[in-house]
């Protein structure tokens, strides 16, 4: 600045830096902070929508909508510079699907988004949905990577909101080889209960209470949340991937990762008269 320039008429220089994948504004612009506050509140209000609430309740294991994936949705909204009027069901499902694309290895669970986003004839509209996802991605400048630090900065703006209590359990994280005894038909869509999850101890009729933990009415220790006694046994099923067979353990038997020896005893001969 020259000595003759009046500092009161000089333009305010605003700097923008990337910290942990999140934009941070400098220069003391209060409007930007107010705008960010509006965006957070609009997003949290969208999560309170009854249709979104129902969708989230069908994901009791938080496989496609845990707290980090939800935080990524808000980051995507901000990177795409969505208007507040664009904070809609459609935008949420597009951004959530893109977040799953970026972070999740399994393809099956995220397909549950299709019937919620597209309705009854969703299978005829998947192509258009994926095109809209790509348009959102382009609108974001193809910046879909979000760091954990960035997600936690988003959560810190409203640290006590129930959405940030959606912690995924360890057995649903990491790389896993999935060998289901009975294939689960996905997606299920609105009006149907989510698949039963033995490790989480969440039967279908209990999952609807687990959206907001403070209102949970189905503790895991009650008899209603246990599997039927008839299923508490070792069972042998055909291995679709080759080999002899798979052993399916009852939910009460929790084994640490390692190598185990399996001893199979011959079936005792039938007694006479039986």
Swiss-Prot record:
Pfam families according to UniProt: Spy1
UniProt GO MF annotations: protein kinase binding
Tissue expression as described in the entry: Expressed in a variety of tissues including bone marrow, kidney, small intestine, liver, placenta and testis.
Tree of life domain: Eukaryota
Keyword terms, alphabetized: Cell cycle, Cytoplasm
Gene Ontology cellular component terms for the protein in this record: cytoplasm; nucleus
Locations listed in the record: Cytoplasm
Signal peptide: none
Cell cycle listed as a keyword: yes
Subunit structure: Interacts with CDK1 and CDK2. Interacts with AURKB.
Free-text comment on this protein's domains from its UniProt entry: The C-terminus is required for CDK2-activation, but not CDK2-binding.
Family designation: Belongs to the Speedy/Ringo family.
Function: Promotes progression through the cell cycle via binding and activation of CDK1 and CDK2. Involved in the spindle-assembly checkpoint. Required for recruitment of MAD2L1, BUBR1 and BUB1 to kinetochores. Required for the correct localization of the active form of Aurora B in prometaphase.
Protein name as catalogued: Speedy protein C
């Amino acid at each position: 600045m020259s000595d003759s320039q009046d500092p009161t008429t000089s333009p305010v220089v605003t700097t923008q830096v990337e910290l942990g994948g999140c934009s941070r504004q400098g220069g003391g612009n209060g409007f930007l902070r107010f705008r960010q506050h509006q965006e957070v509140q609009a997003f949290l209000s969208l999560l309170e929508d009854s249709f979104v609430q129902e969708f989230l309740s069908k994901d009791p294991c938080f496989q496609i909508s845990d707290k980090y994936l939800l935080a990524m949705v808000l980051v995507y909204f901000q990177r795409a510079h969505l208007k507040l009027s664009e904070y809609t069901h459609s935008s949420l499902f597009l951004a959530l699907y893109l977040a799953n694309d970026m972070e999740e290895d399994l393809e099956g669970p995220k397909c549950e988004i299709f019937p919620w986003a597209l309705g009854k004839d969703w299978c005829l509209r998947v192509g258009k949905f994926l095109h809209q996802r790509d348009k959102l991605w382009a609108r974001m400048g193809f910046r879909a990577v979000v760091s954990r630090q960035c997600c936690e900065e988003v959560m810190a703006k409203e640290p006590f909101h129930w959405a940030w209590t959606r912690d995924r359990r360890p057995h649903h994280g990491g790389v896993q080889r999935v060998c289901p005894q009975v294939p689960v038909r996905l997606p299920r869509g609105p009006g149907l209960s989510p698949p039963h999850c033995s490790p989480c101890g969440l039967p279908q009729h209990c999952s609807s209470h687990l959206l907001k933990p403070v209102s949970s009415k189905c503790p895991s220790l009650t008899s209603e949340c246990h599997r039927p006694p008839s299923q508490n046994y070792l069972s042998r099923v055909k291995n679709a991937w080759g080999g002899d067979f798979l052993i399916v353990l009852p939910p009460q038997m929790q084994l640490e990762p390692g190598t185990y020896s399996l001893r199979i005893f011959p079936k005792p001969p039938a007694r006479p008269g039986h």
